[in-house]
Amino acid sequence: MFGKGGMGNLMKQAQMMQDKMAKVQEEIARMEVTGEAGAGLVKVTMTGSHSVRKVDIDASLLEDDKEMLEDLIAAACNDAARRVEENQKEKMAEVTGGMQLPPGMKMPF
């Protein structure tokens, strides 16, 4: 099925991809994204590993309704998480050459 050295080359390529994936995952964990809500009145900065680093609330919101502020914080967190996911997909697509992995399949194996 594989020519001379074909299996060895395939294994070498798989190892190289796995090494690249590990580097990309480290890069993703270090990156930061900022999600916003209320036209930027609430901003949440989150790392690639979904840790919230900072919450910025415009002073004008502190005078308003507590429930609205809570909703905006939740929306900003969700926006930041969505941005992390988008960045992860982009970075992984660079490594896999755009190859789509089955849902739920995590790299490296």
Curated annotation (Swiss-Prot):
<keyword id="KW-0238">DNA-binding</keyword>
<keyword id="KW-0963">Cytoplasm</keyword>
<comment type="function">
    <text>Binds to DNA and alters its conformation. May be involved in regulation of gene expression, nucleoid organization and DNA protection.</text>
</comment>
<dbReference type="Pfam" id="PF02575">
    <property type="entry name" value="YbaB_DNA_bd"/>
</dbReference>
<dbReference type="GO" id="GO:0043590">
    <property type="term" value="C:bacterial nucleoid"/>
</dbReference>
<dbReference type="InterPro" id="IPR036894">
    <property type="entry name" value="YbaB-like_sf"/>
</dbReference>
<dbReference type="GO" id="GO:0005829">
    <property type="term" value="C:cytosol"/>
</dbReference>
<comment type="similarity">
    <text>Belongs to the YbaB/EbfC family.</text>
</comment>
<dbReference type="InterPro" id="IPR004401">
    <property type="entry name" value="YbaB/EbfC"/>
</dbReference>
<dbReference type="GO" id="GO:0003677">
    <property type="term" value="F:DNA binding"/>
</dbReference>
<feature type="region of interest" description="Disordered">
    <location>
        <begin position="87"/>
        <end position="109"/>
    </location>
</feature>
<comment type="subunit">
    <text>Homodimer.</text>
</comment>
<protein>
    <recommendedName>
        <fullName>Nucleoid-associated protein Spea_1509</fullName>
    </recommendedName>
</protein>
